[in-house]
């Protein structure tokens, strides 16, 4: 032990020296020369020196090239998230400047910094944009697309998306071609097809820019779905026009057959994309039917099938955006019925996170690509392009709305038209399409410069001023509160009611076709795509059950669920009673009777269309009157049973019947005080309730269904007795006691020290 303690300081110094030597020699090669071995031979002897060189084991090494790409991607994402976080931490800034504007400014600063240090700034590559950054944004928009507003306004959306985009493309292309023919502009070499190609690139409204701005101003649902739906559905028109004019530019000549094939190509691209997306959506729904034992992989099927739908559409040169929208819309109701609540939460937040990161990166790369260049500036061409974008948008919206309002029930007001026209923002899709132009195109750099200028003008000027304009014009905002169960149930009820009205009138509108589609979906589609679907439950009851469960889950998650359980004493007084069930045979017989009585009237009403020259027969009028009388009688019986139940709830009986009754009982009302003597106090007789009847006791021979009455305690009050002179006073006493027994009891808001009756 002493020897060890003496030697310990020396060991510590040696260990320190070893550590210093290792850190000094990190990554440095250390050469060691081995001793020379000499070999002597009798014949041809020679001397050979063998020098062995070896490296020390590197404790710490740096190899940046090995992780360069993923490391830089992670740094870009981290930068985007930090900018997004800092933006929302400054409320004054976020209230004035849209998030997209700030991100573009950050991209400009980062691109300038990269260029200052002598590096080449990265450019938003079209393949990276279309295959990696755009799909999450479109999938998020399509999966959570509000179906009801979209379907109710799909006609208006298609008019703006198809006809409006065609108008913008040809209007801008034609006027720009006329501008280029002026010699002072210096662009006389630009032909018509090149101008039309540029017009098709700039004419489309960008969904990324629209989402970034309209989500912050909280505009009303109608205007939002019109602008956003147009930005989603105009992709097919943009793709067809871009490919068409690019191909015509290479060929040089255009025939009538080429124009006809271009029109056919539009329908193939749009409808083909929808078909591909719907197929993958049904596959995702069918796959989710068998994931009850492996819940952890449920979200992956949603993401993978959606991305495969997009890639398959792009592979066949179809509209990938429409494929993603169709896939999300088709799969959502079936997938959410099969997956667990945790998987639904995972899908929701992952899509929101993924789309938010992609949107942030797109705007930052727009700023960086602007610095990277190259640019070709022409003041006349660029300024004219910006002005024509505004003019064509305003004229197109006003002209199309004038025609659309003739067919709409809810008209688009002047304020709505202004917001729709002012909200036509351009974004990264236009830049990526311009970047796809070949380097040999003589106008490529000028087109890119004009496109970037239009994007900056729409995002900065229109995006920053649209919120003050909405406040100034007092445009209706979106309702933030979610509809209650009562509102949604009545909305569903009104849909069925309007379907019946359309059937009676003989006019088959969208409510009729919606009912047909829902019936087909419930009868055939859900049977194969939803696991354990209860088809025997009525649709309205199933909808109410679903909404009630959804609201209960929301209340539990928010911590607003009140305590509704009864007390322990009340629970002890509840006696469990076996509820008899109706047999299948008897239930089918009841259904047959109800169907025979209700369906006949429905068939009679639908058998003929409305005509003011046609009168109903007398027997049909008698049948209608008989049905009304039956319904009135059933309603009266229901009200009587409700009154009996309320009386039985508030009628009290003395606990000890054998206790001597006092000589005088005092009954005090709020209006007056009256004292009853023992002789004048009326007698109350009580009858025991009869035992409850079972469903087997229901007679099926009657055509109408009797409302079952709840057994209650009945009280029979004898009238006052006395001579003729006291009849009036006795009747008053009798009425007061009857009021006492039939009154529902004291108000809960009254104080406890003021009882209703005291004995």
From Swiss-Prot:
Q: What is the lineage of its organism?
A: Eukaryota, Metazoa, Chordata, Craniata, Vertebrata
For this record, the Gene Ontology CC terms, alphabetical, are: basolateral plasma membrane
Q: Which InterPro entries match?
A: Cation/H_exchanger_CPA1, Cation/H_exchanger_TM, NaH_exchanger, NHE-1-like, NHE_CaM-bd
> From which organism does this entry originate?
Oncorhynchus mykiss (Rainbow trout)
Q: What is this protein called?
A: Na(+)/H(+) exchanger beta
Can you tell me where the transmembrane regions are? 15-34, 76-95, 98-117, 123-142, 150-169, 196-214, 226-244, 262-282, 312-330, 353-372, 377-398, 447-467
Q: Where is this region: Disordered?
A: 681-759
What family is it from? Belongs to the monovalent cation:proton antiporter 1 (CPA1) transporter (TC 2.A.36) family.
Question: Which positions bear Phosphoserine?
Answer: 641, 648
